[in-house]
Amino acid sequence: MASTATGSREAARFEMPERLRADVRQLGDALGQVLREYGGDALLADVERLRELTIASHHEDQTVADDAAALAEQLVASWSLDRADEVARAFTVYFHLVNAAEEYHRVRSLRAGDRADHPLAGTVAKAVEDVARLAGHDKAKHLLDGLEFRPVLTAHPTEARRRAIVTSIRRIAHLLERRDDPRLGASEDAETHRMLLEQIDVLWRTAPLRVDRPGPLDEVRTAMSAFDDVLFHVVPQVYRRAEMALAGGAETVAAPQVPAFVRLGSWIGGDRDGNPHVTSAVTRQAMAIQSDHVLRALESACTRVGRGLTLDAGSTPAATELRRVLADAQAAQPELYAELAARSPNEPHRIAVLYAAARIGATRRRDADLSYTSAAELLADLRAVQASLAEAGAARQAYGELQGLIWQVESFGFHLAELEVRQHSAVHRAALEEIRAGGVLSDRTEEVLATIRVMAQIQARFGADACRRYVVSFTQSTDDVAAVFELARHALDGRPIALDVVPLFETGADLAACVGILDGVLELPEVQARLAETGRRMEIMLGYSDSAKDVGPVSATLALYDAQDRLTAWAREHEITPVSYTHLTLPTT
């Protein structure tokens, strides 16, 4: 399947870089080979003919363009339903391949411009470098110490691709990267091409859409592929590059100065506003899926790091604290410890990290005898290993791969991402009316209370930061925030729960009234207590889509800027620093 043609206004307007053009050409040719193998020359000829006519329909000569469009319509009308389906799938696969090539070309271009002494524009490392250059190292370090970067995973409402399709596309991108490796010999290059044809054939033969609409847990599992393949590995690289930028581009072998400032959030499995399929049971299962993925990733990473610490006790003796950790391990699990010691004789740091990996696996399996009670307990063990290595003069081992693992534990914990709950204020008002009236509660009210109980259960297992944000959609009064605290008291019979109730202002009227509403929110005792705990930090959400529907996109944008300006002044007046704004920039059409 060819990739370019002449005579097109679009081709002239969007000229591909040569390396991208070569990738697209190779992928198009490979797809053509797959189509020929599947349906013979006739299928490929139909696809090519439609492609040529479609390109010609954009010709600068309007008569040529109109004739080509008419011929294309006639061609499609002549096909059977099965042939039309095959051609449509061929073009779908082709566009997937072009997108994969474009994404990889962007990565290739970014890598080409990435230098240790000159970080890429738009990155955290570049921001750190700029601040250090303009305001000094100490100022940059101070800003990093207070930084929290919090990307939130959401389910894309228009994402219809199956995970199998996404996986195949990702494998094809990896093969494009492998093909660029200059170390490949002729046989390895041929094998890469064979694997590319195999993956394109898989993509062609895989049904592009699910038979059933994906449920919330399907969406959670889809998001986990991004964590498994990208986020878990990229986050420590972000820290490492920020560390280098803070050091002026120089390599360091000292204790890192960059804290773990990334904390993931997720609305998938927690956002129930308008979605009856997101129940308390779904929220519980969503967290279980998240935890399983992060624990598997940590176990694998810990095992890899441990296997690399083949430093014997003669050259790198264990410090006092690490000897205590090892003694505790031997007393708690003598058989496991003996097995590890036999495989790693006289290698105390290796034994300690591999023992930690075994405990992570036990935590995932819910093996109470061996599991960790918290991510903090794992961090304590890893830091004991790190301190021992540093004390023995093995700074490269202390602050190398082991530091990357520590950053991962600090960033993801045992829960991966904070699961945020969102519900409409009207649902809370209706639930409180039922509770105050007495009598039998409706299923919807019981579900509201059950959700809060699940939040408490998640906090009990993974810590308060695993599920503490409760977003109130369409916040219109102070009572809408107070309602969540009152519902929590009913749900838990007064037992404590850590809650950050986040007001979400969405309409033009609510944006205009937000400062007055927040004046009342500040008076709530639960909010006062939380401000004292956090150094007077507060999160506020400003909605975009519904305000745009309410007053129009231009007026909504102005209202958002005005609201943020007034909220900043309000926060300064009440010594709330910093105030965090989250903008929901959802589609308006």
Positions of predicted regions on the chain:
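A conserved P-loop NTPase coupling/switch region
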Residues: 494-498
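Active-site cores of enzymes that catalyze phosphoryl transfer or operate on phosphate-rich substrates
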Residues: 394, 399-482, 486, 490-493, ...
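Generic beta-strand/beta-sheet core signal
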Residues: 265, 270, 279-281, 419, ...
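Hydrophobic cores of alpha-helical transmembrane segments in multi-pass integral membrane proteins
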Residues: 32, 567-571
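Conserved small/polar residues in nucleotide/adenosyl-binding loops
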Residues: 582-588
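Often metal-dependent polyanion-binding catalytic scaffolds in large enzymes
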Residues: 1-437, 444, 499
